[in-house]
Design a protein with these regions (language model features):
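AMP-dependent adenylate-forming
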Residues: 4-26
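Conserved pre-ATP/AMP-binding loop-to-beta segment of ANL
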Residues: 12-13, 127, 138-156, 162-163, ...
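Conserved AMP-binding A3 loop
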Residues: 26-28, 152-179
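Conserved AMP-binding/adenylate-forming
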Residues: 39-82, 94, 217, 271, 278-295, 302-358
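Adenylate-forming
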Residues: 57, 101-108, 223-226, 239-285, ...
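ANL superfamily adenylate-forming
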Residues: 104-149, 255-258
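Conserved AMP-binding/adenylation subdomain of ANL enzymes
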Residues: 175-192, 202-240, 255-258
Length: 358
């Protein structure tokens, strides 16, 4: 299985991507778009595992750009808010062969790429295009989707304790993680997620986007998290779930207190939390306000996101608990790489199909 075959899960006329005030993109249109972008990139001389940096704002075009590049080459999404010096570091470290930017953007990545002689191409959205549609080049060439062992996504660790490290993830890593998360959340093609996570981060890319696509489900791609708009967006889109970090959940709860009517009757099937520890008080309040399971999960970039998760069933979630392993093997080891008992203190070690080959 690869990212390109993952996209075959959705029925032709099923909705894949939506965005506020935009026509929806169906799975048939998404597959055509992904294949067209693959041919356009091939026409510029790129092939499987070649890295393509993507610097675009959150939204449907960023989502489809990731899926298209990862299906045929290797996607290297970067934070569109970086400074030129930061782009210079990441571009030099990643050595992409191309940078994709939003049409008309004056992002400083242009100058950083120019200094490194890396070509930049604009993603041009046509009038009345559905959410996620854009074009890069006029010329196209035959293109072969990436294989299971080709690099699909490359990100950096946060670098909070040392120099950020490159984390390459291959196609089978992404597929395994999407499958594991979809299973733990019991996703189906009737689910609709509101994405509020940045799409240059493993959480949004895998837990929301790739996982939904693997089940033929749909994703509403907002321009980014806005607590003032969240409840209205959730109601208008009739979403069944969302995934966020604790600070987002806290901001949503603050709005829910001020907009009690808007918070009622959303009918959420679940709320997922990851990327930081969810305070027990926030866990309880989310349960109380939205009347649905709150699923806290534990993940890291090197594991293509999720390693453990709370079970979905009623009453099976525990506050302050990251859950049980969701397919990868997880254990605690000491500095000599000897396994320890579960109540011992040591390093968390993982092994599985979703773990980066390094």
């Amino acid at each position: 299985m690869t990212i390109r075959t993952l996209l075959d899960a959705g029925a032709d006329n099923a909705v894949a991507l939506t965005a506020p005030d935009r026509p929806a993109m169906t799975y048939a249109a998404l597959r055509q778009h992904v294949d067209s972008i693959g041919r356009q990139l091939a026409g510029s001389g790129l092939g499987p595992s070649d890295r393509v940096a993507i610097v675009m704002p959150n939204g449907p075009e960023m989502a489809s750009a990731f899926m298209a590049v990862a299906a045929y080459m290797s996607a290297a999404p970067l934070n569109p808010a970086y400074k030129e010096s930061e782009y210079a570091f990441y571009l030099e470290d990643l050595a992409p062969k191309l940078v994709i930017v939003e049409a008309g953007s004056e992002n400083p990545v242009r100058a950083a790429a120019s200094a490194l002689s890396i070509p930049v191409v604009e993603a041009v959205v046509g009038d009345n295009d559905p959410a996620g549609a854009f074009r890069l080049f006029e010329a196209e060439a035959d293109a072969t989707p990436a294989g299971a062992d080709n690099e699909a996504l490359v990100l950096h660790t946060s670098g909070t304790t040392s120099r950020p490290k490159v984390v390459p993830l291959i196609q089978r890593n992404i597929m395994a993680s999407a499958r594991n998360i979809a299973t733990s959340l019991e996703l189906t093609d009737s689910d609709h997620c509101l994405n509020i996570m940045p799409l240059f981060h493993i959480h949004g890319l895998i837990a929301v986007l790739a996982t939904s696509m693997s089940k033929g489900a749909s994703v509403c791609c907002t321009g980014g998290f806005n607590a003032l708009k969240f409840l209205d967006q959730a109601r208008d889109e009739k979403i069944s779930w969302y995934s966020g970090v604790p600070t987002m959940h806290q901001a949503i709860l603050l709005r829910a207190k001020r907009q009690a009517d808007a918070a009622k009757g959303l009918g959420l099937r679940l709320i997922r939390s990851s990327s930081a520890s969810l305070p027990p008080a926030v866990f309880e309040e989310l349960n109380d306000v939205f009347k649905c399971p709150v699923i806290e999960a534990y993940g890291m970039t090197e594991a293509a996101h999720q390693m453990t998760s709370n079970p979905l069933g009623d009453g099976k979630q525990k506050a302050g608990f990251v859950g049980i392993a969701t397919s990868p093997e997880v254990c605690i080891m000491d500095q000599e790489s000897i396994r320890l008992n579960g109540d011992a203190e040591g390093e968390v070690c993982i092994r599985g199909e979703n773990v980066t080959p390094g």
